[in-house]
Amino acid sequence: VNKLYKEDRVKFITQGNFLIDKARDLYRLPVEAPIKYFPNPVDIDPEFDVETYPKKDSIIFIGRIESVKRGWLFCEIAKRMPEYQFYMLGQTFREKSRNESIMNKYHTGIPNLHFTGHVEGKEKFNYIRDAKIMVNTSIHEALPITFLEALAYGTLLVSCQNPENLTEKFGIYTGTVLGDGFDSIDLFVNAIRTLMTDEDKRKKLSVEGHSYV
């Protein structure tokens, strides 16, 4: 990539300003190398009213069911918060048998945890619209389009990733979570409970997140 840049055969764009320095380091680019900001396009529902829509006491996870996403943390959170409904949207792709073997034990015995499989389009947006919080437990992220899709419906963020400071602005950033994350489950539980039990704060952040998108 560095060679292509020097030959003026490649241009750089980014979905998040926080990625610019990372790109310069990764590709050994000079400080003056132009990297233009191109925000992700997000579908906006013109009929959705963030101030009046009756959200449910539901919490969602959207992503591939793979080790890098650490979906088992979402399941453990659900186990500790039986008063809320948890919906896991996604399926396994790479290392399918290994990832399924890790998650199999969570498919029974947790009545408030629901596995939807892969969903898209209207069905996916229905889950996002109804949820009060989206949880992200990934080891690393750039700027997930799901963060923006969630905010477009006033759904707050709880995550150990904070791209563009979106999580701390429109939800709660747990801080860095290393390894398998089992020792940090309470960070997510406490963050979710803080938002779910303070309706005034939740609604305020919900409106602000929607306006941001």
Would you name each region that the model predicts?
Residues 2-34, 42-44:
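A short, active-site helix/loop in glycosyltransferases that binds the activated sugar's phosphate group
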Residues 24, 36-57:
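Acidic anion/phosphate-binding donor-loop and adjacent secondary structure
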Residues 66-80:
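A conserved mid-protein helix/loop that constitutes part of the nucleotide-sugar donor-binding site
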Residues 100-119:
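Nucleotide-activated donor-binding/catalytic signature segment of Leloir-type glycosyltransferases, i.e.
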Residues 139:
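Aromatic "clamp/platform" in nucleotide-sugar-dependent glycosyltransferases that forms part
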Residues 156-160:
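Short hydrophobic beta-strand element within catalytic cores of glycosyltransferases
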Residues 194, 201-213:
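A short, well-ordered alpha-helix in the C-terminal region of glycosyltransferases
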